[in-house]
């Protein structure tokens, strides 16, 4: 679903009506929530919205390619309040978090973040959130697009652990790009530069309560700014845009181009409930030697023992420049046999290539393998290549 602003009207594409922005009843109803930054993003030029975690997310500030250049040359501010938080507290909160994920958290310090997986009893991935440890027994899961709140509450019922699982009033923004550090210094002072990659700290900006982490969904230098009072969303957005004016800051949206360059996953596209961590090469996020009987442990042991039947790979497509990301899964063929699918594809103007993430039969996953992709009624040649496509060691993001 994509909502598009046309002139003074908000149109729901593939639907038969439009609502003006002045209509108080704009939207699909209260089941799809607006973020605290919604009005600000419209003022700053958002022309299209998608739906993610039952919320509107800005997806169109004009040219996606220009958004990409803004990101990698200066900085962009993205409304990612759709990364809804699951808050876990209580005397057994740490034990519960370790039950929920196969990643070893024994060295996770207070003030640290970790990229984790949440899997079901069959080892299928339910979400790939960032975990934030605010205190000894106080955690947030910053979610991808699925209802982990319900899953966590369900697991807690029979866990025998003392935990409280809720959704807090927390709405993140992402400030990403090489100039993001300078903008943050202008807002919070030089001490913000001491914040290390994948760590967090509590801040207050003119009475606005925040948690700031050195994380983001861009593979660029960046920060996530977690607002802890939704009533101050408009004020926060304006303060950041004002501070970034002299640094080339632009309003923007998460860049499909940059995240595919960086090999970053998009849940529902590159991973889902039928995908296991080993197929994605995420063995490091699974600790099968743990004494904890975490959800999915037995299934993951069996998958590891039996071996995977398919694998995620990088692909270069040899065709005309793609006009935008794929909106369907494109079949990958070995002659007449379907052996996989393209999950995310885009043209990279920096690399001057069509690049993609794909899931293929393990027999065809070797680097250099030449295959074909069916794009609508065309057959396109392709080659399996190394991923990520750019900055594979994440030196930019961690700098």
Regions from the PLM with identified roles:
Residues 13-116, 124:
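Acidic, proline/glycine-enriched N-terminal capping motif
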Residues 2, 74, 115, 329-331:
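Conserved beta-strand and immediately adjacent loop positions that scaffold enzyme active sites
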């Amino acid at each position: 679903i994509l909502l598009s602003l046309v002139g003074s009207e908000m149109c729901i594409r593939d639907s038969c009506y439009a609502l003006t922005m002045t209509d108080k009843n704009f939207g699909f109803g209260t089941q799809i929530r607006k973020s605290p930054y919604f009005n600000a993003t419209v003022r700053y030029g958002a022309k299209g919205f998608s739906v993610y975690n039952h919320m509107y997310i800005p997806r169109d500030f004009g040219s996606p390619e220009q958004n990409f250049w803004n990101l990698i040359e200066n900085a962009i501010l993205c409304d990612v309040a759709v990364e809804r938080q699951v808050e876990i507290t209580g005397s057994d909160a740490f034990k519960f978090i370790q039950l929920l994920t196969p990643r070893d958290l024994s060295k996770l310090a207070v003030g640290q973040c970790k990229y984790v997986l949440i899997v079901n009893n069959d080892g299928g991935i339910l979400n790939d959130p960032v975990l934030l440890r605010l205190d000894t027994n106080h955690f947030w899961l910053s979610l991808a697009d699925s209802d982990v709140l319900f899953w966590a509450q369900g697991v807690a019922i029979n866990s025998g652990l003392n935990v409280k699982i809720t959704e807090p009033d927390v709405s993140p923004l992402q400030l990403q790009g090489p100039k993001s550090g300078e903008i943050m210094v202008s807002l919070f002072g030089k001490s913000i530069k001491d914040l290390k990659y994948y760590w967090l700290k509590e801040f207050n900006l003119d009475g606005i309560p925040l948690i700031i982490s050195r994380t983001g969904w861009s593979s660029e230098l960046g920060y996530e700014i977690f607002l802890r009072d939704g009533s101050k969303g408009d004020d926060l957005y304006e303060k950041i845009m004002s501070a970034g004016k002299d640094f080339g800051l632009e309003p923007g949206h998460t860049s499909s181009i940059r995240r595919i360059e960086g090999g970053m996953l998009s849940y529902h596209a590159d991973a889902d409930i039928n995908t296991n961590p080993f197929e994605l090469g995420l063995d490091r996020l699974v600790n099968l030697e743990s004494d904890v009987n975490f959800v999915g442990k037995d299934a993951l042991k069996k998958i590891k023992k039996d071996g995977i039947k398919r694998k995620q790979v990088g692909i270069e497509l040899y065709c005309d420049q793609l006009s935008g990301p794929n909106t369907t899964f494109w079949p990958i063929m070995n002659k007449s046999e379907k052996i996989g699918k393209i999950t995310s594809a885009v043209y990279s103007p920096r690399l001057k290539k069509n690049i993609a993430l794909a899931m293929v039969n393990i027999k065809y996953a070797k680097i250099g393998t030449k295959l074909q992709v069916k794009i609508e009624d065309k057959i396109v040649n392709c080659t399996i290549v190394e991923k990520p496509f750019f900055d594979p060691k994440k030196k930019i993001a961690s700098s």
